[in-house]
Amino acid sequence: MASTVSAYKEKMKELSVLSLICSCFYSQPHPNTIYQYGDMEVKQLDKRASGQSFEVILKSPSDLSPESPVLSSPPKRKDASLEELQKRLEAAEERRKTQEAQVLKQLAERREHEREVLHKALEENNNFSPLAEEKLNYKMELSKEIREAHLAALRERLREKELHAAEVRRNKEQREEMSG
């Protein structure tokens, strides 16, 4: 049984799909049988112990006979009445107008946004000069105050040193007078 299954598997590997299908339907194929599938012919050459051999013949587009199935075209629509055509034209015109209005609305919104941005930029530019001048004046005043405070502190230290030096001189003179 196992040898039969393995032999069957080997046979299946050798057979083409087409011969497999044909052998399922026709156990004994007729000699030199020609099968037609659309624009190709399959001709059985001979049957061997190892399998079957076939010749596949493709027809050129010019050889296609009128008997072969033609690609089906979509079914023709019935003739539309004048009223239907008029309704379609009106609907198309309405869609076009709606689309055009929508595009114009978007353009108007874009222009309005551009105007707002430009106006804001001009406003900031006009406000920038006074603000910059104000900041500069503030910084100058602040640095002037800091400088004056620093100079006042230096003067105070210098005055204290002079007072200390005068006291030291006085003490020295008093010692000299006492000792001398």
From Swiss-Prot:
The keyword Lipoprotein applies. A lipid is attached at residues 22, 24 (S-palmitoyl cysteine). One of its GO terms (cellular component) is growth cone. Neuron specific. The modification Phosphoserine is found at residues 50, 60, 65, 68, 72-73, 81. Gene3D superfamilies: 6.10.280.30. Residues 60-74 have a biased composition (Low complexity). One of its GO terms (biological process) is negative regulation of Rac protein signal transduction. InterPro entries: Stathmin_CS (IPR030514), Stathmin_fam (IPR000956), Stathmin_sf (IPR036002). Keywords: Cell projection, Coiled coil, Cytoplasm, Golgi apparatus, Lipoprotein, Palmitate, Phosphoprotein. Pfam families: Stathmin. One of its GO terms (molecular function) is protein domain specific binding. Residues 75-179 form a coiled coil. Residues 38-180 form the SLD domain. Its main location: Golgi. Residues 58-81 are annotated as: Disordered. N-terminal palmitoylation promotes specific anchoring to the cytosolic leaflet of Golgi membranes and subsequent vesicular trafficking along dendrites and axons. Neuronal Stathmins are substrates for palmitoyltransferases ZDHHC3, ZDHHC7 and ZDHHC15. Belongs to the stathmin family. Interacts with STAT3. Interacts with CLU (secreted form); this interaction may act as an important modulator during neuronal differentiation. This is Stathmin-3. It comes from Rattus norvegicus (Rat).
